[in-house]
Each structure stands twice: as structure tokens, then as C-alpha cells.
């Protein structure tokens, strides 16, 4: 049997990030063959990940990737078991790598990387979801990760002129839009983007609430309720967090100030755990 040295174990740990005893056992099992030991560890990692795959992953982070030209942003929700691991540097690096990989290819197969990281960190890790937004015209992708990386936001904002994107009012607008989405949690960009079945259900609820009113008054009351509903769930209809006017009116005011057209085209908001069932 080949003698396993401390130097070999240290080198294998550096290459794989696996634990000391795991590296020693891998080298022993493969008689000092480093490549075979790496493969042995990968197989062990996969087995370890399988054992841990049923553990609850209620913690985690939202990771962000923005391309160098600022034209494509990607959000990823990655869940783990404990907040301690969510704050771990190795886990954070892993999350950033996953976000970059999904930016390149939204359908990327990252299972091997996930199982290897499960073995290294010692907790169940799940790549829960990812989404990207991009622009192929003048404008910018606004991004924001809230403190603790529990909420992440993307928004695409189009302009008529490229030079608008370099102005301070526009940059401030991007920041304000992401803060609005973070704080107010809109469900849709505008009225056209709302789920029409859900909208009709809101109308039915309102009609039931006021069924004892005169018939001619019911529809006016219902439409008033729906207008209020729009102001709560549609981003452009929401009250802007920094003023009394709506988000739509605030964007229009900035556009007028800059002599350009500015339009919010789409947004994504991820919050850790919001897709998990109780």
C-alpha cells in the first residue's frame, strides 16, 4: 500500500476543499492516485448530497450577476439549512458562481457543482430558481440586493437616448425603482400584466361585500375598490415611496426633466423562502 503523506493530503484539500479525513481516506482508497482520489471524493460528495437532500432548506440568499455592459441581470435563489452557512464565505462564493453560470445559460446543469458543495459545506443546498432580464436598446438594468441578501430585485428601464443613462437623475431613478419594488412588493408591472382571473375574483369579493347597496351604486363602488387594488399591486400605479405621486408619474417627471422617454419594461423580485410551502 502506498504511503500517504501530509503534503499529498494538503494538496488534495486545496484542490477539492474537502475535509482532512475525507482527503486522507480518498488517497488511501486510491493508493495515492490524486486524480482517482478527486473522483472518489466527487462520488462521496454525490452520496452525501443524496443523504442530505431531504433536509429542510429554509435559509439562503438571493445572488445577483450583472454583465459588464450592464445590459443583463440575473437573480438566483439558493437555499440552505442554516443562517450560519448562508453567511459563510464559501457558500457566498458558490452562490456568485451559480448566478454567473445561469447568466450564461439559464438551463445550465449545475448538479455536480451543487453536490460537491454540499459535501464541502455539510448542509443540504438547493438551487431553487433563477431569472434574467436584459435590454437590447438604450437604457439600463437596475439591480438591488437588500441587506442580508434575503431580497433581490431586477428592473429593465428603457430610454430614448443612450446619454440619458449617464445622468445623475436617471441613476437615482434606477435606485428608487429598485427600492420601490423591494419595499412595496408589487405583483405586476401594470394593469395589463395582472392575472385576469385574480382580478375578476377581486371584483366578485367587492360585489359580495356591498350586495346590500342599491344596484346602481354597486358597480361604482366595485370599480373604486379595483382602482385601490391596482394602486396596491401594480408597480406603475403604486404610490411612489418618496413622494405623493404614483411611480408612473414620477418616472414621467424625471423623463421630462431629462428631455427623453423613460419606460419601466419589466421587473423581477425574489425573496428567500417565498416559494416554499409551509
Explain the meaning of each model-derived region:
Residues 2-278:
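N-terminal assembly/interaction segments in proteins that build large macromolecular machines
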Amino acid at each position: 500500500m502506498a504511503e500517504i503523506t501530509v503534503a499529498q493530503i494538503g494538496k488534495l484539500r486545496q484542490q477539492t476543499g474537502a475535509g482532512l479525513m475525507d482527503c486522507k481516506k480518498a488517497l488511501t482508497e486510491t493508493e495515492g492516485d490524486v486524480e482517482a482520489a478527486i473522483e472518489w471524493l466527487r462520488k462521496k460528495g454525490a452520496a452525501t448530497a443524496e443523504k442530505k437532500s431531504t433536509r429542510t432548506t429554509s435559509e439562503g440568499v438571493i445572488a445577483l450577476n450583472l454583465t459588464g455592459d450592464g445590459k443583463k441581470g440575473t437573480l438566483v435563489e439558493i437555499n440552505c439549512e442554516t443562517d450560519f452557512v448562508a453567511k459563510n464565505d464559501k457558500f457566498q462564493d458558490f452562490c456568485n458562481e451559480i448566478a454567473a453560470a445561469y447568466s450564461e445559460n439559464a438551463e445550465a446543469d449545475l448538479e455536480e457543482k451543487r453536490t460537491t458543495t454540499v459535501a464541502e459545506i455539510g448542509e443540504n443546498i438547493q438551487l431553487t430558481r433563477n431569472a434574467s432580464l436584459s435590454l437590447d436598446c438604450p437604457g439600463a438594468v437596475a439591480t438591488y440586493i437588500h441587506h442580508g441578501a434575503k431580497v433581490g430585485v431586477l428592473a429593465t428601464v428603457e430610454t430614448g437616448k443612450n446619454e440619458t443613462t449617464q445622468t445623475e437623475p436617471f441613476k437615482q431613478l434606477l435606485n428608487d425603482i429598485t427600492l420601490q419594488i423591494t419595499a412595496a412588493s408589487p405583483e405586476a408591472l401594470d394593469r395589463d400584466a395582472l392575472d385576469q382571473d385574480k382580478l375578476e375574483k377581486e371584483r366578485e369579493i367587492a360585489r359580495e361585500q356591498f350586495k346590500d347597496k342599491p344596484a346602481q351604486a354597486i358597480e361604482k363602488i366595485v370599480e373604486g375598490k379595483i382602482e385601490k387594488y391596482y394602486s396596491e399591486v401594480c408597480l406603475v400605479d403604486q404610490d411612489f415611496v418618496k413622494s405623493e405621486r404614483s411611480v408612473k408619474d414620477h418616472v414621467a417627471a424625471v423623463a421630462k426633466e431629462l428631455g427623453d422617454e423613460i419606460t419601466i419594461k419589466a421587473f423581477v423580485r425574489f425573496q428567500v423562502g417565498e416559494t416554499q410551502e409551509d
